[in-house]
């Protein structure tokens, strides 16, 4: 059994105890509470590059990357310098600014599906807005989403949502009326026949299909060959829209996201995380004829006080500039391959049933023989073993996502030496689970 007592976390424990009296569960987002892995959550003090430090002075190699945005590494000096310059001009205007144009052009140039874009403040907000847009453009009410795909915490999407909902063991959430989710149809991810059946049963009623093209909120699940293309063909056939939620995969699997990687272009795309460079941001965009429905150009209303604020735009612009440098994605892929293949090899040699994989700067490891093709497969994982593995790695200075149902992330700041240290820690932990 891996020790869970050697890591000094006295200050973290004290701060978390106080936090529980101030905030529900002591956190601002449920997965941070470590409910699915056991033990006390770590309270962080500062971050730099591939590393994080907690309030007790412990240092960790980080594979959470603030849940995806930190693809260039934490506190990248060029991003920080750009933000310092922007701060001198103010934190928010509540009015148009040139920086919005700059980031919009960069996003449009990068993402195949996006001809126009609207900036918002989070991935949840982007998905809420795109849902309204799907309905406004098609005049239809029903949507299809996939079990285990997470599109934020809006009521309509909290059906078989994976991610933090799966971590809590809840099928959805109290407080969501049945009438709100009545128009949300669900299918297993990677099951094209199930989607065909839903279209056949609901002709002329489905506004569109939304999915994570590579699932990161049931762990790490990749599409079967032909699945994404099959969805493209089905939505075309039925006059419905195809929406890729690339909040997690955008600019992480490749510069043009999953749609560039797999060669399938949706009608609309949601973005977040990376495009804000670590600041709160979201975006949705797509075909010009669809985006022209958005107010004030069209009748579909959506607004936001801090949308397009200069700090988020500045961090996003500098982050994308860094990602444009030659060799960036080859470097990310090599680091992630070294980590993912190393973890699988070590775990199997230690006698554990595992499966997993990687694309770009995103990876996953399941404690089940697999293959994992959908949410039901992911739920077969040995959650207790994952919890012990997570705690063991934490003891050895490696911070992984505190849930089996979350993907992991690498960054440009991770080195081959970091990966070797991680694999050495994993070998020790896995041999003693």
From Swiss-Prot:
Q: Which pathway does the protein contribute to? A: Porphyrin-containing compound metabolism; protoporphyrin-IX biosynthesis; 5-aminolevulinate from L-glutamyl-tRNA(Glu): step 2/2; Porphyrin-containing compound metabolism; chlorophyll biosynthesis
Annotated GO biological processes are:
chlorophyll biosynthetic process; protoporphyrinogen IX biosynthetic process
Q: Which molecular-function annotations from GO does this UniProt entry contain? A: glutamate-1-semialdehyde 2,1-aminomutase activity; pyridoxal phosphate binding; transaminase activity
Tell me the compartments it is located in: Cytoplasm
Name the GO cellular-component terms.
cytoplasm
Q: What are the EC numbers?
A: 5.4.3.8
**Residues carrying N6-(pyridoxal phosphate)lysine:** 273
Q: Report keywords, A-Z.
A: Chlorophyll biosynthesis, Cytoplasm, Isomerase, Porphyrin biosynthesis, Pyridoxal phosphate
Assembly behavior: Homodimer.
As for family, the record states: Belongs to the class-III pyridoxal-phosphate-dependent aminotransferase family. HemL subfamily.
| Name of the protein | Glutamate-1-semialdehyde 2,1-aminomutase
Q: Which organism is it from?
A: Crocosphaera subtropica (strain ATCC 51142 / BH68) (Cyanothece sp. (strain ATCC 51142))
């Amino acid at each position: 059994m891996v020790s869970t007592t050697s890591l000094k976390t006295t200050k973290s424990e004290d701060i978390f105890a106080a936090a529980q009296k101030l905030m529900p569960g002591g956190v601002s987002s449920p997965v941070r509470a470590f409910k699915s892995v056991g033990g006390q959550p770590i309270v962080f003090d500062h971050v730099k590059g591939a590393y994080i430090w907690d309030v007790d002075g412990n240092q960790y190699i980080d594979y959470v990357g603030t849940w995806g945005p930190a693809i260039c590494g934490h506190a990248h000096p060029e991003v920080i310098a750009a933000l310092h310059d922007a701060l001198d001009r103010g934190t928010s205007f509540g009015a148009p600014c040139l920086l919005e144009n700059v980031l919009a052009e960069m996003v449009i140039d990068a993402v195949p599906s996006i001809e126009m874009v609207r900036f918002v403040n989070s991935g949840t907000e982007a998905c809420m807005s795109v849902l309204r847009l799907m309905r406004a453009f098609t005049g239809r009410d029903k949507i299809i989403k996939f079990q285990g795909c997470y599109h934020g915490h809006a009521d309509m999407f909290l059906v078989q949502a994976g991610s933090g909902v799966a971590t809590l063991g809840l099928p959805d959430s109290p407080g969501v009326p049945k009438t709100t989710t009545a128009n949300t149809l669900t299918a297993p991810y990677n099951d094209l026949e199930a989607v065909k059946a839903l279209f056949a049963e609901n002709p002329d009623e489905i506004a569109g299909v939304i999915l994570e093209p590579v699932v990161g909120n049931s762990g790490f699940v990749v599409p079967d060959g032909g699945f994404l293309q099959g969805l493209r063909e089905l939505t075309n056939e039925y006059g419905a829209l195809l929406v890729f939620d690339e909040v997690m995969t955008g600019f992480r699997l490749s510069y043009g996201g999953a749609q560039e990687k797999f060669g399938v272009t949706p009608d609309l795309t949601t973005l977040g995380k990376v495009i804000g460079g670590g600041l709160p941001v979201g975006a949705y965009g797509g075909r010009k004829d669809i985006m022209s429905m958005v107010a004030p150009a069209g009748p579909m209303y959506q607004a936001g006080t801090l949308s397009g604020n200069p700090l988020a735009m500045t961090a996003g612009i500098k982050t994308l500039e860094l990602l444009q440098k030659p060799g960036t994605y080859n470097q990310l892929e090599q680091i992630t391959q070294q980590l993912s293949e190393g973890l699988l090899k070590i775990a199997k040699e230690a006698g554990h049933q595992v499966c997993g994989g990687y694309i770009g700067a995103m990876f996953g490891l399941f404690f089940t023989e697999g293959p994992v093709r959908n949410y039901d497969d992911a739920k077969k994982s040995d959650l207790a073993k994952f919890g012990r593995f997570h705690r063991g790695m934490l003891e050895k200075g490696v911070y992984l996502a505190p849930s089996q149902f979350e993907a992991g992330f690498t960054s440009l700041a991770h080195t081959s030496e970091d990966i070797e240290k991680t694999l050495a820690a994993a070998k020790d932990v896995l041999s003693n689970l």
